[in-house]
């Protein structure tokens, strides 16, 4: 596992369905990655679902147009067997001399799993994911033939060349730790366990205390809206994610979701829209996004982030950082953080 002295920030690349056409999508994907490089963001999460382009293909274009940007690629086991994923990692690191990080997912949308004939129950999906990561690590780390026999994957004396040229190019593996099975698997197999955090006390009780003492790092996925004044920030937040009836209906449905993080966020949103004057569930309540938002002036948001860092958070996956203005405002927040990149 890895040890970090500084906080690692990742942005995200929106799906192609957010844009009017190929040209607009690619121009914006590259622009976001280049802004990430310019403003000290490690890399960007590229999503996987049935409505977006393949994240490996998108990342290959982005890497050609950036110098340091590290893709954080959502990896769904039914899409790529571990051998294929390992070969892609090997090829990307060889061609670009750059790391590829992985966000291991099991799938929060039951319908997509059923469509591919890959549906298995929640607990079994994490058992399969654990095996997947074991095989992936064996392939990337072993300098001799690899054999493995599990319930889902089998390798027989497999030769896998060439080796990654430098240990610094080994992928950092992120995994959701919102459910009990996810957290248990992440603590055994990942470098980072990720959650959509609750407000500080909730996060401490339900997540950070369970991770403390392990070699695995904590990561959170959150959006930030910060401005010179809290009044400005809240005005922007409400304009970006206005209340609507459909969102409220969907919110109650999410309390019955198979996804534990969807249920948790829905329950928090139903209990209160705002916590600690900064932690806002309005974007999730209204169906606009799938994460909480920190809203306030630069000092308020920086202070709240610092409290997460005191609870052991070492990586932040930032939502909706799509323009240079977004990066500038986040840079102002970072100025008030006690352990900046």
UniProtKB/Swiss-Prot annotation:
Coiled coil feature spans: none
CDD domains in the cross-refs: Alkanesulfonate_monoxygenase
GO molecular function, one term: oxidoreductase activity, acting on paired donors, with incorporation or reduction of molecular oxygen, reduced flavin or flavoprotein as one donor, and incorporation of one atom of oxygen
Disulfide bonds: none
Keyword Oxidoreductase in annotation: yes
Pfam family, one: Bac_luciferase
Enzyme class: oxidoreductase
Catalysed reaction, written as an equation: 4-(gamma-L-glutamylamino)butanoyl-[BtrI ACP] + FMNH2 + O2 = 4-(gamma-L-glutamylamino)-(2S)-2-hydroxybutanoyl-[BtrI ACP] + FMN + H2O + H(+)
Keyword Calcium: no
Biological processes per GO annotation: alkanesulfonate catabolic process; antibiotic biosynthetic process
EC number of this enzyme: 1.14.14.13
Keywords per UniProt: Antibiotic biosynthesis, Flavoprotein, FMN, Monooxygenase, Oxidoreductase
Function noted in UniProt: Monooxygenase component of a two-component system involved in the biosynthesis of the side chain of the aminoglycoside antibiotics in the biosynthetic pathway of butirosin. Together with BtrV, mediates hydroxylation of gamma-L-Glu-GABA-S-BtrI. Not able to hydroxylate free substrates, activation by the acyl-carrier protein is mandatory. Octanoyl-S-[BtrI acyl-carrier protein] is also accepted as substrate.
The family this protein is said to belong to: Belongs to the bacterial luciferase oxidoreductase family.
The protein's name: 4-(gamma-L-glutamylamino)butanoyl-[BtrI acyl-carrier protein] monooxygenase BtrO
Organism: Niallia circulans (Bacillus circulans)
Taxonomic lineage from the root: Bacteria, Bacillati, Bacillota, Bacilli, Bacillales
């Amino acid at each position: 596992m890895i040890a970090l002295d500084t906080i690692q920030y990742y942005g995200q690349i929106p799906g192609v369905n957010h844009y009017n056409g190929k040209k607009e999508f690619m121009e914006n994907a590259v622009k976001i990655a280049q802004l990430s490089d310019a403003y000290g963001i490690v890399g960007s999460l590229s999503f996987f679902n049935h409505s977006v382009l393949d994240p490996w293909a998108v990342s290959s274009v982005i890497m050609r147009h950036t110098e340091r940007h590290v893709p954080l690629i959502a990896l769904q086991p039914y899409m790529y067997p571990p051998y294929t994923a390992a070969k892609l990692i090997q090829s990307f690191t060889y061609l670009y001399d750059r790391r590829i990080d992985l966000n291991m997912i099991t799938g929060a949308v039951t319908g997509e799993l059923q469509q591919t004939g890959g549906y298995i129950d929640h607990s079994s999906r994490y058992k399969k994911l654990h095996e997947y990561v074991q095989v992936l690590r064996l392939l990337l780390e072993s300098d001799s033939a690899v054999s493995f026999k599990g319930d889902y994957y089998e390798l027989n004396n497999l030769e896998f060349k060439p080796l990654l040229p430098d240990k610094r190019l080994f992928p950092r593996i992120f995994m959701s730790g919102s459910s009990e099975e996810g957290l248990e698997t992440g603590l055994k197999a990942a470098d980072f366990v990720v959650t959509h955090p609750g407000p500080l006390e909730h996060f401490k009780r339900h997540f950070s205390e369970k991770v403390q003492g392990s070699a695995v790092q904590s990561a959170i996925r959150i959006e930030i809206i910060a401005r010179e004044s809290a009044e400005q920030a809240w005005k922007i937040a409400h304009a970006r994610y206005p209340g609507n009836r459909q969102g409220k209906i969907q919110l109650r449905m999410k309390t019955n979701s198979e996804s534990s993080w969807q249920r948790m966020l829905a329950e928090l949103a139903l209990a209160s829209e705002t916590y600690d004057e900064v932690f806002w569930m309005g974007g999730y309540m209204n169906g606009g996004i799938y994460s909480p938002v920190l809203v306030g002036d630069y000092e308020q948001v920086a202070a709240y982030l610092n409290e997460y860092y005191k609870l052991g958070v070492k990586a932040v996956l930032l939502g909706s950082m799509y323009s240079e203005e977004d990066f500038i405002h986040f840079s102002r927040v970072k100025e008030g953080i006690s352990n900046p990149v």
